[in-house]
Swiss-Prot record:
Main location: cytoplasm
GO CC term (a single one): cytoplasm
Assembly information from the UniProt record: Heterodimer of HisH and HisF.
Protein name: Imidazole glycerol phosphate synthase subunit HisF
Organism: Lactococcus lactis subsp. cremoris (strain SK11)
């Protein structure tokens, strides 16, 4: 089993970290960069900044925030929200991000995935997919615009297309599970993980360390992304990793020297 990544996600609105349930009822938590620095100290493998209103309200992510984060963090930073063109990719990467996450724009212009992969490399291209079960519960459908618009597109088919176009990894969020703290959507994750050969990041629903252990034991997810568990002090990244290792799930832990 490859080393599993633990990735705190900071949902950002108006420059502040927020967290809600099922994409609504948002509560402001704090400064993105200061929170990210705490997670890095706790041994987070990467950080994700998602501007959750940028796509819907057609606002661009503030480059200054990205630049400040890039200067103060040494772990990889993925940035998403409001990415609509190859120029947006160029601007975000130039500001200091290591990867760019696209969601709505990938659906509206799938060629953007291919174009970005060719120009910047597949390692820079993350396709974020928000999905939920259809009415019958037999399959999953893709949503865009911050989860406000149902595209009617089948999740598994879209994930396969993203891989073919050049996506380096998929960030898969279950809208049914997001913010509920009831565990990851294992059925959704298994459906996608079994259909693609690129890394899949599990997102939506983490409420305890046992949920993280479960997602790695019961799916082929390469990484786990979460917010609520960390933002409200219910667990730390290093506590999560220690439990993973106890359960024979490989995780990176850097022990700091005591001077």
């Amino acid at each position: 089993m490859l080393t599993k990544r633990i990735i705190p996600c900071l949902d950002i609105k108006n420059g502040k970290v927020v967290k809600g349930i099922n994409f609504v009822g948002l509560k402001e938590i704090g400064d993105p960069v200061e929170i990210a620095k705490i997670y890095e100290e706790q041994c987070a493998d990467e950080i994700v900044f998602l501007d959750i209103t940028a796509s819907f309200e057609e606002r661009e992510i503030i480059g200054e925030l990205i630049g400040r984060a890039a200067r103060e963090l040494s772990i990889p930073l993925t940035v998403g929200g409001g990415i609509r063109s190859i120029n947006d990719f160029r601007r975000i990467l130039a500001s200091g991000a290591d990867k760019v996450s696209i969601n709505s724009a990938a659906i509206e212009n799938p060629e953007l995935i291919h174009q970005a992969a060719n120009e910047f490399g597949v390692q820079c291209v993350v396709v974020a997919i928000d999905a939920k079960a259809n009415e019958s519960g037999s399959s999953f459908e893709v949503y865009i615009k911050g989860g406000r618009e149902n595209t009617g597109i089948d999740l598994v088919e879209w994930a396969k297309k993203c891989e073919k176009l050049g996506a380096g990894e998929i960030l898969l969020t279950s809208m049914d599970k997001d913010g509920t703290k009831t565990g990851y959507d294992l059925k959704m994750l298994n459906a996608v993980c079994s259909a693609v050969n690129i890394p899949v990041i599990a997102s939506g629903g983490c409420g305890s360390i046992s949920d993280i252990i479960e997602v790695f034991e019961k799916t082929k997810s390469d990484a786990a992304l979460f917010a609520s568990l960390f933002h409200y002090g219910e667990a730390t990244v290093d506590e999560v990793k220690e439990e993973l290792i106890k359960n024979r799930i490989p995780a990176r832990i850097i022990k700091k020297e005591i001077i």
